[in-house]
């Protein structure tokens, strides 16, 4: 995706969600618009992957853990979707630092221990190796 295409998608999200232009949007609004872009693209990718997995009869892993220490996800999501450079350049044109937008993201707070980080690594590993899997936990 080019910087221009990404800038248009970002502006469209800011307009539809908040009714603002990138030049006057708050960092929180930009963060949420970027997160929405990532969610939309990941949902499309997930839908395609699930369809392929079901079509080929792949088995699925269901991982149950008390906690998942995922940390912040926007930076990694943009990177994994191949959007990091486009996002950085689109924001730089508006004199906004992508790093300052990353700071808007709260920590998921889904645990605080080594097992939570290990569980997150298992999920990352499944995603990286294209293993169809889902992590389940409780909200406490």
Located regions from the model:
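A conserved ligand/cofactor-binding region detector
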Residues: 1-140
């Amino acid at each position: 995706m080019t910087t221009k295409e990404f800038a248009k998608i970002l502006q469209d999200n800011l307009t539809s969600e908040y009714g603002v232009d990138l030049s006057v949007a708050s960092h929180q609004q930009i963060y949420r618009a970027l997160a929405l872009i990532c969610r939309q693209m990941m949902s499309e990718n997930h839908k395609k992957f699930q369809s392929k997995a079901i079509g080929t009869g792949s088995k699925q892993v269901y991982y149950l853990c008390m906690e998942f220490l995922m940390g912040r996800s926007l930076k990694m999501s943009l990177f994994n979707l191949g959007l990091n450079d486009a996002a950085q350049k689109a924001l730089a044109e508006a004199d906004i630092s992508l790093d300052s937008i990353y700071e808007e993201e709260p920590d998921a707070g889904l645990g605080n221990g080594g097992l939570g980080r290990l569980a997150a690594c298992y999920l990352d590993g499944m995603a990286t190796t294209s293993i169809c899997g889902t992590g389940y936990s409780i909200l406490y």
